[in-house]
Amino acid sequence: MIKKPRGTTDVFPEEVVYWQRIESCARKTAAKYGFGEIRLPTLEMTELFQRGVGDTTDVVQKEMYTFQDRDGKSLTLRPEGTAGTVRAIIENGRCSDALPLKLYYILNCFRHEKPQAGRYREFWQFGVEMFGAAGAPADATVISLANSLLRTLGVKDITLHINSIGCPKCRPAYHAALKEYFSAKKDILCPTCQGRLETNPLRILDCKNPECKELAESAPKTIDFLCPECEAHFASLKRCLDAEGIEYGIDPMIVRGLDYYTKTVFEFIAPVVGAQSTVCGGGRYDGLMKELGGPEMPGIGFGMGINRLILAMQGSGVTLEPDDRPALYIASMGEKANETAMGIVEALREEGIHAETDLCARSLKAQMKYADKLGAAYTLILGDSELASGTAKLKNMSDSTQTDVSLSDIAALRSLVTE
């Protein structure tokens, strides 16, 4: 038996209903905030993520699915959506669009991680990106959008954690403080973080190794090294969130796992998910557009994991069932009755009615059992006598009442099965 690759999922109708609810609510919420949808290629040039996400990140060093195509070009299955969105804006000449430019996407991403509950190698994200607005009100707007969606979906006990990781002006002093702190404890660091100590000490704060995490808790905090501009930006963000009535906590451990972030970073935590409790994460990336060859243009956005959102909804007691019960099932006996039944159900389908009939040459008893299993609201038995009279009995499956109907009056039949 051929099995699916590790870390991927098969999603059947009873769970797809959660995906559909999330996607529908995400689109409606994004539209309320003025965001339009963008669709991006699954494959990108590897250089995009090396330059955009950062060479020293776990994503680039350990997690990307990268290969050479037949032309010898290095391609990568996208591990996230922000870099591709920026690339699309630059490549298609959209930097001169009216600002702020607001875009959202729903897409699958790929990372070679250890699969566990809420963490997959192919995972889906709803993400938003806003370009051209440098102030904290833009940050608060993006956070508000995420907050609104999570509450619309019924996720309980959500908490918002915010931090500022500074900008290129103030980050060197912070990097120096981190390097000094971790150098004294280098022997305790994992081999990967010992290398990060020289290349990018900020990434040590994002390490999942227990010893490194414990050391990171006592490390210097970013908010103690902010320049006046970043301090003012963070203070403005807090005032905006207060004005919007959005509760938050300051978490100096949030640095996010991608190098393009500047100033504001944030996460929404849903404890009902379990160990992988971050259901949304994002921040500001004011230098990414220029880094990838475009003009200087500030950006702010987030990614929300759909797989984890489903766990959060289910853990919060949100129960959804597929709305796929047929309004009518026609049980037919004989070739002529089968053909007539096919014509009736197709006419009803043209009217937007979910109707079914037998396709497997079942006995009448087996057909009625199948109709009950489908949860059909009404059934109609069609045989030689019904064909001869041109009428049949329509049975309401909930109360067993029966009504005579004309086989030629599709409008009347439609009216009865949609009452």
Residue spans of the language-model regions?
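TRNA-recognition modules of translation machinery and tRNA-sensing kinases, especially anticodon-binding
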Residues: 1-365, 370-412, 416-419
